[in-house]
Amino acid sequence: MGFEDDPYRDVDGEPIVDFDDFGNDREPSTEPLQDFDEDLADDIGDWDGEGSQTPVYDNDKVAKPRKRLVKKSSSERVTIDVPELIDEDVDDAEFDEFMGGRGGGSTDYDDKVGRKRKKEKERSSSGSGKEKRHKFPNRGERKSEEIDEMWKSIAHNPENDEEGVRTMDDDNFIDDTGLDPSERYGGDAGDRSPTHYPQAEEGEDEDEVNNLFKMGKKKKKTERNPAEIALLVENVMAELEVTAEEDAELNRQGKPAINKLKKLSLLTDVLGKKQLQTEFLDHGVLTLLKNWLEPLPDGSLPNINIRAAILRVLTDFPIDLDQYDRREQLKKSGLGKVIMFLSKSDEETNSNRRLAKDLVDKWSRPIFNKSTRFEDMRNLDEDRVPYRRPPVKKPSNKATMESRDGDFDLEIRERKTGLTSGQSSRGDRQMTMRPEATPLDFLIRPQSKIDPDEIIARAKQVSQDQRRVKMNKKLQQLKGTKKKRLQATKVSVEGRGMIKYL
């Protein structure tokens, strides 16, 4: 038999690969893991070398093998920390005893391990320029290094309690130079804690806190007594009255009256304050407003801004006309006449005219005891005296009387001839009478047949009936959808009428 064609055997027929060296996947391997660890250590040591262990050859067989170029850095070479896999502190003798106890005699694996250990010893003993092989630290050394690092981090922590170097700021913090030693803070008199001076420490903190809280608060307004308020109101009213008189004088001189326009902001601000409105009413502010609103001496109205501002102020002004004093004050001031004039003036704007009409309605009803209820208005109509037209006087016909006096002789002549005046007038003249309107003055008012309560009840009933009709329609629709007529249909053999089922 020839083994030339078998790729897994050599020329002598021996197998190229010994399958006994490989373990079964299903069975646990009995070989130790030290071989893998040693190979890994060798590989790491080889990486620390200068060149690569795998030379690159050119296609030319004559050329020498060239090594890969490795760029050397100026900094120190960094060693790689590989996690601990085996404990190298175990002596070679113990390892040999362990291996001998397992298998007995020497094996190929033992030879390999021995050769590798010799190489390691040679590398460590050689004094060449190559760096020594990195030795993996054991567990004890690693723990000690971690503890040292921990203590170093604690020592360099800025939050530690160690006392640092004293600076000038520390000296100036509590400056007790020039004081009696017994009064110094923490001096020779004994240890003193900050609680020994509670007033000084707490006082400063409280001041800072109070200042922070006071920043957002408004200052409390000082309350004035009634005498001061009355004096302030009198001064303001005097100033405003002088302003109105100055504008009237400027208008007589033909100059522009702008003083009231300048003081308008003061007027609106002062009269807009609720706490001062009652005081202004007591001092007769309605007369002042009448002087500001009335036409100027040349008949022109004041500025439109003045009129609009005063009308808005009067709308919100608390004039209680239920009180007798307030009603009399409003009547004597003459302000109502000016407001009535503005409500009917064609020169006034629509908005101001509307405000004036609202004021007239609001003030006139309490003064004239008018009611806004419809029933009261009906009673007023019934109590009112009906209007009667004066009797029409027939004009006396003086011309006919004169003609009759002049025709006296003619009448005598007619009598002689046997004709009366009536016959002659009828035959000779055609008279027409002007129709006169009969006076339609009714004395008895017809009774109203409209009952408002009945109308309201009828409207409610109609609305309820409409709702009921809508609900009945909806119920009928719901009932109609449920009840579907099921009728048997005749199926045609020819397929007629089947389109409806598709």
Swiss-Prot record:
Where is this protein found?
Answer: Nucleus
Q: What is its main location?
A: nucleus
Q: Which UniProt keywords apply?
A: Brassinosteroid signaling pathway, Nucleus, Phosphoprotein, Transcription, Transcription regulation
Question: What outcome is recorded for mutants in which this gene has been deleted?
Answer: Semi-dwarf phenotype. Stunted growth characterized by reduced leaf petiole lengths and small leaves. Altered responses to brassinosteroid (BR).
Q: Where is the PTM Phosphotyrosine found along the chain?
A: 185
GO cellular component terms, semicolon-separated:
nucleus
Q: Where is the composition biased (Basic and acidic residues)?
A: 1-12, 138-151, 181-194, 401-417
Q: Does the keyword Lipid metabolism apply?
A: no
Annotated stretches, region: Disordered? 1-61, 87-208, 385-434
Keyword flag ATP-binding: no
Quaternary form? Interacts with BZR2/BES1 and SPT6 (via N-terminus). Interacts with ASHH2/SDG8.
* Role of this protein: Transcription factor involved in RNA polymerase II (RNAPII) transcription regulation. Involved in transcription elongation. May function at post-recruitment and elongation steps of transcription. May be recruited by BZR2/BES1 to target genes and promote their expression during transcription elongation process. Required for brassinosteroid (BR)-induced gene expression. Required the for regulation of numerous nitrogen-responsive genes in roots. Acts in roots to repress NRT2.1 transcription in response to high nitrogen supply.
* Name this protein carries in UniProt: Protein IWS1 homolog 1
Which gene is annotated as encoding this protein in its UniProt record? IWS1
